[in-house]
């Protein structure tokens, strides 16, 4: 039986990532310390999977997009650091379970077919909204899988219902 250990809402300004700020990170020192503290707590909990919702992933008015590629990768090229790259293993089983539970609850959720991704110009690249916290977490937690979810424009009740689907899927898993 799996369990959700904690939840965090983290800021994600790229300037807090070492090598990107070029001195500007001093202006965000309190943010850096807060993100480091959260990352240390996550590292102590040792979750096998991190479920992360990012406001910069492709989002829809009526659909929760759950990235479904086997490997979730991204970099900071848009912020002048193309060699700062990250790659994570997607927990596809948990992602699929979340999507299935959501559908049963009447919330449209899941991945997208390659043709849909092309149609909408969607890339499976992990965006900075996820990468910034993950680059701090990765320093504290060596091994984990990832479920990456967009932040959709759904009414509050549907979002709450979707959260309950995440909870149910995790409980039924070994995560």
Which residues does each PLM region occupy?
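A generic structural signal for short, non-catalytic loop/turn and secondary-structure boundary residues
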Residues: 1-3, 141-142
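A short aromatic-anchored loop/beta-hairpin motif
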Residues: 2-110
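Glycine-rich phosphate- or other oxyanion-binding loops that anchor nucleotides, phosphorylated ligands
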Residues: 114-174
